[in-house]
């Protein structure tokens, strides 16, 4: 070709194009001009052929040019004869012809014949030339984008195009044969038998270039000359397209989200998280047939690319040469391999697809009315969708294009489609794309497509041709959503909680008798479609990490994954975590509810059932989790723990390894939960250890006692045999024989020693005998005296029916002298229910053997709940404080109240219901003041720490549920301090059960704040102690509670009331010298719903606080106040003694 100057080059360039209305900078292909201007030596630069008269075209110099053609030339099928340009005949195959610049787009030199035999034909994808008046649709700087759509110049066709008309648009042009060559050109030589013609594509249809075919050596046996000629033409065409595409600079701002590697192979770069490949990347065929991809070789036969207004790129993959005949093509069954490859790779972030409405898919049948297997159908999103971590969804900018590629594998040759009306003959297949709303799948979103002039038109379905036993690849680009999703604006830099989403549906439909039937469809993940102005949204880098309110802190909204891009918790770490500090857990009682004590025995049993093992993780799991596979571990098995402790095991879903293996329902263990089980088990072991230590101590004490007894027995035996055996024998012999016969016996002894020894022995024995007699006599007198005193005391204490027998040991303890400096001790009294009693030895302990039995007074009674005693000890060991029985008249402080004694409460006896003065108790009434009253009748020994409360001296003994008789008329009027009404469940329930019109004010709850000890109806002892208007609570105080301890009594009411302390009384002398009752100002009251009164543990054995609850502002402690609505509360404290 001759070298031309710049002016002629520009003239030739613009003469080859119809530039009317298409001279925008984005539409003019100036690559040839820039190449010519940039090169100094442009001798090798080739321009497209300029239209010239037909007479000037000479056949030896190359094929004639088509008027208005530029760039690529259409390739006629092999055997169809040479053609000039698109329709002209090709010259006969020649050998050794040099490559002409005008033929570098597909008309290369005729290759040499291949002599290796026949092989499978390899068809090249047809390429349409640039039509006059149009330019290449894609700008030269957007090589990564899809080709632009072809144009339909008829406006009426654009408005009336429907899926029904898709099957017939351009059919005549596609099926017409190439016109004969011009008459002035010489005719071509006789062609071989013509194969099926390629369809004549419309002028504006451009097909995307596919990867080059494998080398000739991989083609199998030799090819026949026509197939060889066409194969070599295809090789040259693909090489030129690849070289031309490589010169186009890629767009720097495009993000690659999907790989165009072979669909059924897993690229090593994908596993390593490297940059993903773009469409058109050259990928060599794998050496092993088992992993071979479906080669993208176009088959023979007509090509149906679609209507004139839809851009698409179709490629078909034939069965590889090594595939055995009769077996299904691996290219048609590639979905399983693709799922195990890039789709399940955790480092491969791409939008996912899933089948859509499978229950509506139709079935295909062949010409013999046999049902065909399900076709393979896969959709890939090539570009346009970027994953946003902050939004946890894929984002598509409305101004940007998105592109999808569909792979369709057809098994068999379909002729009919099954419909509800029966089998219908097929007209055509087409792809339909539309969007749906996530919250309403029945609402469709239209898809638009950009044209070459940047305008947008509604997207119409793409007609595709599906040859049998082949895979068809369809690429549709330059797509947009017609609208954006709702609620896209962020709130304070965070994703909108009301964000709406779209989903893209790509469906393959069949057209039969003016009806459409879905054969396969896939739907994408949720998509956010944003407006065209990206400034409305903050970048992901600003949204992910933001500055917190505190200095030098940042926060992230959402989940965080380290070494993983799919965190299912707030923080997921694949690898080891090093913590130099401590891990904190919430444990505040105020944030908890339903708190219950655990059974440590069960925890010990569960821990004993758990198996502890040594193990190592599998290499594939260690690689995906980021841990070392060789490091030995010690732990438990989740499946075994799930059977023992199900709440400690959690299912986290499926785990996919790098090699494609999957663990379904992967289980993880909450070791914190197992740790707490260990704490409970250790507590139970501590209890068992303490019990064993106590038993060992008891055994050691008994062992020491037995050893002492053995030593004493041995000393007695040796002393009696060594010291008194000789003297005793002489004394017995001297008393039995006459004195005058003794000298012969003494003659054998020494004369001076025998008389002295006999005299001393006799005097010693006589003195010892006299002393023993005196001691025995004194013991008998003492025992008799004590017995008489005990009988007299019992007569004073026991009632007329003799229902009580007092232990003699208790009286002995009272008469035993006490150390003035030590603490006074009282006899332990067991709780009783009055009836016929019996005296027995009690050996009850707290489960510890070897405790000395104590003499306790018990009765047979029904069991009841144990009362909680007031036990507060500030320092260990706790001193035992016990008061002695009173020996004088009741002592009161005249300044405590208006009277010396409090107003007694109504008695259970009707004739003592009114107020009156209490009578002092007799001195001999010792037992009544320390008597333990309980409904359960359980006696406690010396070592018991939860003693039953001791009853008040003013409480009449109630009738218990004993097995013996009971006196219903039994009363102690002379000893009654105040009557006791019948017990009730709670103070608040009296008001509800009486049903009175004007109920007396009462309290809803009472407790001691220092140890949160509630005072409930359990302390209403005996029966009838609590009733409407009068509540008497008997509160036991343990012997370890120190004297002068200040407590706070909190009383709550449902309505505002007034509470006043009326009196503080005691009938006994103080336990220590100088003890006195507290003075207080009378008629001090508190008002409201919550009242707190100070209470002091006085140095008295028993003392009583009297509070009165009245209406608001009517506090009065006088006896006349009984007429007004008021409730009296008596809190009787009594000290327990071991």
From Swiss-Prot:
Changing residue 399 to A: Abolishes DNA-binding. Residues 67-88, 329-339, 891-900 have a biased composition (Low complexity). GO terms for biological process: central nervous system myelin maintenance; central nervous system myelination; oligodendrocyte development; oligodendrocyte differentiation; positive regulation of DNA-templated transcription; positive regulation of myelination; positive regulation of oligodendrocyte differentiation; protein autoprocessing. Specifically expressed by postmitotic oligodendrocytes in the CNS. Not detected in the peripheral nervous system (PNS). The chain crosses the membrane at residues 769-789. Residues 178-198, 286-302 have a biased composition (Pro residues). The record marks 586-587 as: Cleavage. Disruption phenotype: Embryos die around 12.5 dpc. Conditional knockout mice in which Mrf is lacking within the oligodendrocyte lineage display severe deficits in myelin gene expression and premyelinating oligodendrocytes fail to myelinate. These mice display severe neurological abnormalities and die because of seizures during the third postnatal week. The keyword NADP does not apply. Glycans are attached at residues 1030, 1052, 1116. Residues 56-150, 171-200, 246-267, 279-339, 721-753, 891-922, 951-999 are annotated as: Disordered. Residues 250-541 bind DNA. Pfam families: MRF_C2 (PF13888), MYRF_ICA (PF13887), NDT80_PhoG (PF05224), Peptidase_S74 (PF13884). Changing residue 478 to A: Abolishes DNA-binding. Changing residue 454 to A: Abolishes DNA-binding. Residues 790-1138 are lumenal. Its EC number is 3.4.-.-. Residues 680-711 form a coiled coil. A motif (Nuclear localization signal) lies at residues 254-257, 491-494. The keyword Cell membrane does not apply. GO terms for cellular component: cytoplasm; cytosol; endoplasmic reticulum membrane; Golgi apparatus; nucleoplasm; nucleus. One of its GO terms (molecular function) is DNA-binding transcription factor activity, RNA polymerase II-specific. InterPro entries: MRF-like, MYRF_C2, MYRF_ICA, NDT80_DNA-bd_dom, NDT80_DNA-bd_dom_sf, p53-like_TF_DNA-bd_sf, S74_ICA. Homotrimer. Interacts (via C-terminal region) with TMEM98; the interaction inhibits MYRF self-cleavage. Belongs to the MRF family. This is Myelin regulatory factor. It comes from Mus musculus (Mouse).
């Amino acid at each position: 070709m001759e070298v031309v100057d710049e002016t002629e080059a520009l003239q030739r360039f613009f003469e080859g194009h119809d530039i009317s209305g298409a001279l925008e900078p984005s539409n003019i292909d100036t690559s040839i001009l820039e190449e010519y201007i940039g090169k100094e030596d442009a001798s090798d630069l080739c321009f497209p052929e300029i239209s010239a008269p037909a007479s000037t075209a000479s056949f030896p110099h190359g094929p004639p040019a088509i008027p208005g053609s530029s760039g690529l030339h259409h390739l006629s099928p092999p055997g169809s004869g040479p053609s000039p340009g698109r329709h002209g005949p090709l010259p006969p195959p020649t050998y050794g012809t040099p490559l002409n610049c005008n033929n570098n787009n597909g008309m290369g030199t005729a290759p040499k014949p291949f002599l290796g035999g026949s092989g499978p034909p390899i068809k090249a994808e047809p390429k349409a030339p640039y039509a006059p008046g149009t330019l290449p649709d894609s700008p030269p700087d957007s090589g990564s984008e899809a080709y632009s759509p072809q144009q339909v110049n008829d406006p009426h066709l654009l408005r009336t195009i429907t899926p029904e008309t898709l099957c017939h648009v351009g059919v005549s042009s596609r099926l017409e044969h190439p016109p004969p060559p011009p008459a002035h050109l010489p005719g071509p030589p006789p062609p071989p038998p013509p194969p099926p013609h390629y369809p004549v594509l419309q002028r504006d249809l451009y097909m995307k270039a596919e990867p080059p075919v494998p080398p000739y050596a991989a083609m199998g046996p030799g090819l026949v000359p026509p197939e060889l000629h066409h194969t070599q033409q295809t090789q040259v065409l693909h090489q030129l397209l690849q070289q031309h595409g490589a010169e186009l600079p890629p767009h720097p701002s495009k993000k690659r989200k999907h790989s165009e590697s072979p669909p059924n192979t897993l690229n090593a770069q994908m596993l390593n998280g490297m940059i993903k490949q773009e469409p058109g990347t050259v990928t060599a065929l794998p050496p092993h047939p088992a992993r071979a991809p479906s080669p993208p070789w176009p088959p023979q036969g007509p090509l149906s690319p679609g209507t004139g207004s839809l851009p698409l790129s179709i490629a078909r993959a034939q069965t590889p040469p090594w595939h055995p005949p009769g077996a299904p093509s691996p290219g048609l069954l590639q979905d399983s391999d693709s799922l195990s490859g890039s789709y399940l790779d955790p480092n491969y972030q791409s939008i996912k697809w899933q089948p859509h409405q499978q229950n509506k898919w139709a079935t295909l049948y062949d010409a013999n009315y046999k049902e065909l297997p399900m076709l393979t159908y896969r959709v890939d999103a090539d570009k346009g969708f970027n994953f946003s971590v902050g939004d946890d969804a894929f984002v598509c900018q409305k101004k940007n294009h998105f592109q999808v590629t569909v792979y369709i594998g057809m098994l068999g040759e379909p002729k009919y489609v099954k419909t509800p009306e029966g089998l219908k003959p097929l007209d055509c297949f087409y792809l339909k794309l539309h969007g749906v709303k996530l919250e309403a799948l029945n609402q469709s979103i239209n898809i638009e497509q950009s044209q070459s002039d940047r305008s947008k038109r509604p997207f119409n379905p793409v007609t595709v041709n599906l040859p049998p036993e082949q895979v068809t690849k369809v690429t549709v680009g330059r797509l947009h959503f017609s609208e954006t999703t709702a609620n896209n604006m962020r709130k304070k830099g965070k994703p909108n909680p009301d964000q709406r989403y779209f989903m893209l549906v790509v469906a393959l439909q069949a057209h039969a008798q003016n009806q459409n039937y879905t054969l396969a469809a896939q739907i994408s993940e949720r998509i956010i479609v944003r407006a065209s102005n990206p400034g409305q949204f903050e970048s992901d880098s600003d949204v992910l990490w933001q500055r917190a309110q505190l200095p030098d802190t940042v926060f992230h909204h959402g989940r965080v994954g380290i070494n993983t891009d799919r965190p299912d918790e707030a923080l997921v770490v694949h690898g080891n975590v090093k913590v130099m500090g401590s891990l904190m857990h919430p444990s505040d009682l105020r944030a908890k509810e339903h708190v219950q004590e655990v059974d440590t025995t069960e925890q010990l049993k569960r821990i004993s059932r758990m198996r502890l093992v040594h193990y190592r993780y599998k290499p594939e799991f260690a690689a995906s989790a980021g841990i070392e596979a060789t490091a030995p571990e010690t732990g438990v098995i989740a499946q075994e723990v799930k059977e023992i402790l199900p709440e400690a095991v959690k299912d986290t879903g499926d785990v996919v390894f790098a090699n494609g293996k999957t663990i379904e329902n992967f289980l993880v263990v909450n070791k914190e939960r197992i740790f707490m089980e260990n704490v409970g088990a250790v507590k139970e072991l501590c209890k068992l250890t303490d019990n064993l230590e106590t038993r060992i101590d008891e055994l050691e004490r008994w062992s020491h006692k037995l050893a002492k007894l053995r030593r004493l027995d041995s000393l007695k035996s040796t002393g009696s045999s060594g010291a008194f055996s000789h003297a005793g024998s002489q004394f017995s012999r001297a008393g039995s024989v006459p004195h005058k016969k003794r000298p012969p016996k003494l003659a054998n002894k020494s004369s001076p020693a025998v008389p002295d020894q006999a005299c001393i022995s006799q005097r010693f024995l006589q003195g010892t005998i006299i002393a023993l007699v005196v001691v025995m006599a004194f013991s008998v007198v003492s025992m008799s005296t004590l017995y008489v005193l005990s009988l007299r005391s019992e007569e004073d204490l026991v009632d007329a029916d003799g229902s009580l027998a007092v232990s003699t040991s208790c009286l002995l303890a009272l008469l035993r002298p006490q150390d003035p400096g030590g603490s006074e001790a009282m006899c332990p009294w067991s709780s009783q229910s009055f009836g016929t009693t019996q005296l027995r030895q009690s050996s009850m302990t707290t489960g510890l053997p070897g405790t000395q039995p104590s003499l306790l007074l018990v009765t047979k009674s029904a069991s009841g709940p144990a009362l909680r005693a007031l036990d507060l000890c500030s320092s260990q060991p706790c001193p035992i404080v016990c008061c002695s029985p009173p020996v004088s008249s009741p002592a009161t402080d005249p300044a405590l109240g208006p009277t010396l004694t409090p107003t007694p409460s109504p008695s259970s006896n009707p004739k003592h219901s009114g107020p009156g003065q209490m009578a002092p108790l007799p001195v001999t009434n010792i037992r009544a003041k320390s008597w333990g009253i309980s409904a359960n009748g359980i006696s406690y020994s010396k070592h018991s720490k939860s003693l039953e409360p001791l009853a008040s001296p003013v409480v009449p003994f109630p009738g218990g549920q004993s097995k013996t008789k009971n006196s219903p008329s039994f009363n102690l009027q002379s000893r009654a301090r105040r009557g006791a009404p019948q017990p009730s469940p709670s103070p608040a329930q009296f008001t509800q059960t009486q049903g009175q019109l004007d109920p007396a004010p009462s309290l809803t709850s009472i407790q001691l704040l220092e140890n949160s000890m509630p005072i409930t109806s359990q302390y209403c002892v005996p029966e009838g102690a609590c009733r409407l208007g009068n509540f008497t609570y008997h509160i036991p105080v343990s012997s370890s509670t120190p004297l002068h301890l200040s407590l706070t009594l909190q009383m709550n009411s449902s309505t505002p009331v007034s509470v006043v302390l009326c009196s503080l009384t005691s009938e006994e002398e103080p336990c220590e010298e100088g003890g006195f009752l507290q003075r207080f100002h009378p008629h001090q009251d508190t008002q409201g719903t919550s009242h707190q009164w100070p209470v002091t543990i006085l140095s008295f054995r028993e003392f009583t606080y009297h509070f009165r609850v009245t209406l608001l502002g009517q506090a009065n402690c006088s006896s006349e106040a009984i007429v007004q609505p008021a409730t009296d509360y008596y809190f009787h404290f009594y000290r327990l003694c071991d």
